[in-house]
Amino acid sequence: MKLVHLKKLFSIVKTTTCAAIMLLVYAGGAAYANDRVSEAEHLVTALITELEQISLRDDMTDKDNKQVLDQLVESYFDVDAITRFSVGRYWRVATESERSEYAKLFRFVLLNQANEQFHKLRDLEFKPTTTNTKGDKLILVGGIIHDKSGEFPDVEIFWRVVALPDMPVKIFDIEVENISMLKF
């Protein structure tokens, strides 16, 4: 797959985000998700705790940061679903080779973007505020990100956590001040 095609696939994220989220949101009753609210809250809290601890380490190189971020992404995020969702309808028609190449490129871009912002975590803290269910598979864990240095104002954040039957909960999206990671 040529780089031009991969760039087009990235641009499709904006057009497919609404449809997929609507499917998740309206996928049924809230009973199952309600049973897993504490699991979703724990997932977000555990991720925040790990990020805070890692950000305080002074012995980390860029390579170390990327490796740790890769492990965190694998543990806490539904990377496969995010990757498929970011491509939208083109995922179904892509060959296995194209899917594999896109998944590698998507992960590379995701980790590089996260690594570029990693140093800013030292001054941030997460204050949980609310948790809501949307349908029977989606849980929104909300909170405020506070910048202890005072350089930036507080921002509202929602972690969109998917709770599928017989699967561990995983983060599917992060929404900061009503801007979705998947819409960006």
Q: Where do the PLM segments sit?
A:
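Early exported N-terminus immediately downstream of N-terminal targeting peptides
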Residues: 36-116
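Bacterial N-terminal signal peptides that target proteins for export
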Residues: 2-18
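Solvent-exposed loop/turn segments at secondary-structure junctions
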Residues: 91, 108-109, 147-148, 176-181
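C-terminal segment of classical bacterial N-terminal signal peptides
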Residues: 21-30
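Surface-exposed, charged secondary-structure patches
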Residues: 112-155
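Intrinsically disordered, low-complexity linear regions
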Residues: 71, 78, 82, 133-135, ...
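Short beta-strand edge/turn micro-motifs at domain boundaries
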Residues: 154-183
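Boundary at the C-terminal end of the N-terminal hydrophobic targeting segment
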Residues: 31-35
